[in-house]
Amino acid sequence: MTKFIVNKNDQNQTLFKFLKKTFKTTPISVIYKWIRNKSIKINSKRVNDKNYLLKINDVVEVYDSNKPIIRDQFNYISNVNLDIVYEDNNILIVNKPNNLEMHSIYNLCLDDMVKSYLVDKKEYDIYLENSFVISHVHRLDKLTSGLVIYAKNKISSIILTNAFKTKDQINKYYYALTSYDWNLNDFLQVNGYINYNSNTQKADFSLVEKNNYKYCQTEFKLVNKNLILVKLITGKKHQIRSVLSFYNNPILNDFRYNGKKENDQKMIYLAAFKIEFKSLKKPLDYLNNKVIIKNPDWISRR
């Protein structure tokens, strides 16, 4: 028998979803069988309702000791060096350097760095968390630098993830240095379609709709010569890089998209430098109208 005590990050989710997250390697058919055969007790009473909504301090007992519980597994990093731009009880915003992956099993990655930092602060304990895992709520490409938001608890994760889906509650802005002087309109809104090929690790952009292409929207505003302010409306993989390449203005040092070489560093001149919170729901409504800015180091040299 395995026992869990429901905490604040487990509550208000169904029994089935909780079990699926907690027993990650257990086949779903087995979890259904547990529920169907009443092999689960909640507060000492057998249940067979997969949609039962868990409440804080509920005691969940699973009568199958052969199925492993998979806790969050990550590479702990001692004395981690994070560039923290903003932090409160619910969220953490860090400045990701170039050439650092968001997530990796084998290499140093931002996820492991953030988790290690929160473990050191005693704000994250994998042995006390049943179904919640600290995670970023949006991503940046490996070669792109800039601001990344992490949710410290379940409710914050839900609110922020949904906010990015609605596209009007959080605004993200980038600085991009193009390989050549900007030769388009000072303000350009681009609506089109994009497809990322995992084999070539490149995205293809099209102004007309094609099969397997997803809609994307980007705004570009000229700042000075080849310095461009970019507002990302949709967040597709390599969206900014592929759109700029389509218009023959590839990002400086972005060899994959035919950008001009600036140096031998594993980086491109693209940085997510500003986040605006607009209309987040409670309990994150205190963030509304807050603007977080972290300019890239190279901006002062242009």
UniProtKB/Swiss-Prot annotation:
Keyword tags: Isomerase, RNA-binding
Domain S4 RNA-binding: 13-89
Entry coiled-coil feature ranges: none
Family annotation (Pfam families): PseudoU_synth_2 (PF00849), S4 (PF01479)
Catalytic residues of the enzyme: 141
Biological process annotations from GO: enzyme-directed rRNA pseudouridine synthesis
Enzyme Commission number(s) from the entry: 5.4.99.-
GO molecular function list: RNA binding; rRNA pseudouridine synthase activity
SUPFAM superfamilies: Alpha-L RNA-binding motif, Pseudouridine synthase
Database matches in InterPro entries: PsdUridine_synth_cat_dom_sf (IPR020103), PsdUridine_synth_RsuA/RluA (IPR006145), RluA_PseudoU_synthase (IPR050188), S4_RNA-bd (IPR002942), S4_RNA-bd_sf (IPR036986)
Catalytic reaction(s) noted: a uridine in RNA = a pseudouridine in RNA
Keyword Isomerase included in the entry's annotation: yes
Similarity comment text for this entry: Belongs to the pseudouridine synthase RluA family.
UniProt-recorded name of the protein: Uncharacterized RNA pseudouridine synthase MCAP_0714
